[in-house]
Amino acid sequence: MDIFRILSRGASINKKKDQTSTNSSLIKLSLPSTANKHEHLLDEVERETDFFRTKSHRKLDEPSSKILKSKNKDEERESVAEIVPPLELESEEDARVFRNLHKSKVTGDDIPIPIGSFQDMIGRFKIDKRVLSNLLDAEFVEPTPIQCEAIPITLANRDLIACAPTGSGKTLAFLIPLLQQLVSQNVLKNHGIRGLIISPTNELAVQIFQQLEIISKGKGLNIAILSKQLAGKISNDVVKASKYDILVSTPLRLIDVVKLGKVDLSKVTQLVIDEADKLFDHGFAEQTDELLSHCTNVKIRKSMFSATIPSGVEEMAHSIMKDPIRVIIGHKEAASNTIEQKLVFTGNEEGKLLAIRQMIQNGEFKPPIIIFLQSITRAKALFHELVYDKLNVDVIHAERTPKQRDEVIKRFKNGDIWVLITTDVLARGVDFKGVNMVINYDVPQSAQAYVHRIGRTGRGGRSGKAVTFFTKEDDKAVKPIINVMKQSGCTDGLSDWMEDLGKLSKREKRAVKTHEIERKKISTVPSVIKQKRKQRQNMIEASKRRKQAESEQ
């Protein structure tokens, strides 16, 4: 919808004169009253300019009489929930048609039929009414393909390996069945941690916890995110970890309190490993293994989710799971089809800054935008360059405190910041629904990293754009990116000569993943001026040394 059309909208006149009085009355009922026209228009304009949908809005065509909250709203909802709807997917043939439609590949033994709607869970799994009510209140009306497959598999107590594109609803796909499994158990308070969700980054853990809070409202479950403060309280016996039913955490922080004997994971029956490819990668694999060794319950059910699952990760998953079912939505290493992808050759490092400024000049730079770089030093340098260009920009990296990072994310989601510069610390999981563009200022070191980075745009069915800059030094690193673009059907963003680049050998792939490319400093200052600045700085330092030597004599 065009905001300028909204602002210039006039009356719509129906020229047909042969309508019955009944039709006329129906038309009159559907139009907003004169008293509500102004409010209706303002609400519509506000909705158009709210990039990230952070504000609550009523439906535009909702009559004003329905805006008032009903006193017995909860009773009405419960009465609706009590009506068991017919199953939308009832047979293997229905499941086959559904999977072909959504390009879902499901393998394993005794695979459950997917659900066709959230209401299907009432008849099939006796879903808790309050959980369903919370979903509807949060406007989660229709399940996504990964949710349709993962929920019945988990509720059938099966281990699960799930791979689906970024922004496809994987978080709810594991939270809904986890909640249902726990609320259906009759256990005493302070029984211990029964649900455990492991995430590679604090930002993703916070996001999972926030969604968990929404859909578990009113169920009396104690849930927590293992923040630095909570870990300190548990370590010093100020808080008992056994009071919590569900815990969300990053691996290392949880290991620290487990080693102290302050957290017992032997009661965990539902284990979720989010962003599994990262948690089984070299940097996290040992930590993940150590946590798994403490989850000793014989009834434990494990599931792992990610947008990319390499074959090595799948092998590790099979070694720790019991007869898992494997669900792949789309392609294992393809990006979402809502993202338009493009590769831009900039020649050298200076060309990248010029390319960004050219995009601004040509009107291609459409906020909100996230820009990814390979290191903290480079992220800081680009931040200072773009601040100099008077762009509304901020930066997030590992050197900033969690509080500072949370504040920047909040401001970005609220639209106060239009361009967010970051490292791979924000590449996974964090949900920014309104991001229009992702720019890979530096080529990511693997196809998986690329898919996760560009997955910050094109989420929840919205369209997005991803632009990747590369130089002569990136001739090898860019090849996996080209493969992802081909698998995603984005060949329009490739030049003909790019498609002819050969494949990497195993040794070359390993080298690209493990060795960052050495790049020049980010700056458009000519080398002559840089040299003069350096000479001047050397002269100043020499002068200081002379003065100090003279004063000591």
Curated annotation (Swiss-Prot):
Domain Helicase ATP-binding: 151-327
Motif interval(s): DEAD box: 274-277
Record's function text: ATP-dependent RNA helicase involved in 40S ribosomal subunit biogenesis. Required for the processing and cleavage of 35S pre-rRNA at sites A0, A1, and A2, leading to mature 18S rRNA.
GO cellular component terms attached to this protein's record: cytosol; nucleolus; small-subunit processome
GO biological process: endonucleolytic cleavage in 5'-ETS of tricistronic rRNA transcript (SSU-rRNA, 5.8S rRNA, LSU-rRNA); endonucleolytic cleavage in ITS1 to separate SSU-rRNA from 5.8S rRNA and LSU-rRNA from tricistronic rRNA transcript (SSU-rRNA, 5.8S rRNA, LSU-rRNA); endonucleolytic cleavage to generate mature 5'-end of SSU-rRNA from (SSU-rRNA, 5.8S rRNA, LSU-rRNA); snoRNA localization
Subunit structure of this chain's protein: Interacts with the U3 snoRNA and is associated with the 90S and 40S pre-ribosomes.
KW RNA-binding (keyword) present: yes
Primary residence: nucleus
Top enzyme class: hydrolase
Residue sites binding ATP per the record: 164-171
Protein name: ATP-dependent RNA helicase ROK1
Annotated PROSITE patterns: DEAD_ATP_HELICASE (PS00039), HELICASE_ATP_BIND_1 (PS51192), HELICASE_CTER (PS51194), Q_MOTIF (PS51195)
Native source organism of the sequence: Lodderomyces elongisporus (strain ATCC 11503 / CBS 2605 / JCM 1781 / NBRC 1676 / NRRL YB-4239)
GO molecular function, one term: ATP binding
Compartments, record wording: Nucleus, Nucleolus
Disulfide pairings: none
Residue span of region Disordered: 528-553
Keyword Secreted found: no
Record comment regarding domains: The Q motif is unique to and characteristic of the DEAD box family of RNA helicases and controls ATP binding and hydrolysis.
Motif (Q motif): 120-148
Catalytic activity: ATP + H2O = ADP + phosphate + H(+)
